[in-house]
């Protein structure tokens, strides 16, 4: 006999289909491609570097607060009042033929004009430093863009700002490498690999020279006050040299602002890297036993100068770092140690002679 039919069962909720993962198409590599295969590099940017970059960006692009607008408005009203009062005094002196007062008004006008001119010049130089950050953002966008038409004009503007002549071999190689079918990303990338390294190499040489001078000065000088004054003077000179190489003319306030930004970046991200670099040397080469205390202090001062120069490069450079072309402290560490050892050996051998 056949079994009786079972009653119908109603479920409160509809059945849910289990999601099935879509399979990707199989990828095969040839023998030639397997030799050139390189795994994708994961950006392991330290958290302190990100905090430093955010702080620098906030300093370069300050928010227009209400208090700042009120102060600027008050200064503008005060300046207009001074100009109006000066015009009134000049008219009264001319009408009463008070030539002494008229001469005083003329002298005051010259002084005020010189002050206004210097303020405008400083503002223009400070604006140029801020504009470099915007150019770096624009270059970063072009390096990730597939559009056409902006890359060449942007790179030519950077070359003109840096004072690179049209007949320069690096710029000529760049012109020979680009063509109309390339997009902005490829054109800016070629500029970063062919023209920008010329300026970067000059900046590296300046950093090496100033770092070596700081190392040797601290190692041989017995006066701490002289050391501090020398290091401060040489660091400011280094910032000026790097800014000039990258086509930025620094005024008084822009120089102080750049120096503050560099120190801010070092305070956030420089201490850990500096201690790591010095620790590697001391552990691997036992420098603490071979060098004197003054020599060790000289190496520390030289590495700090190098760190300051690297950060000044980063703030003055019109292009972001690509393909791990950013200089590291290790690039200057071995050079500083070698120069210091050579100097100490010469100083020890000279009395024997």
UniProtKB/Swiss-Prot annotation:
UniProt-annotated stretches for the region Disordered: 1-35
UniProt biased composition (Basic and acidic residues): 1-19
Cellular compartments per GO CC: plasma membrane
Key words of the record: Cell inner membrane, Cell membrane, Membrane, Transmembrane, Transmembrane helix
Keyword Nucleus: no
Main location: membrane
Chain ranges passing through the membrane: 70-90, 100-120, 213-233
Similarity remark: Belongs to the UPF0283 family.
Protein name: UPF0283 membrane protein YcjF
Biological source species: Salmonella paratyphi B (strain ATCC BAA-1250 / SPB7)
Gene giving rise to this polypeptide: ycjF
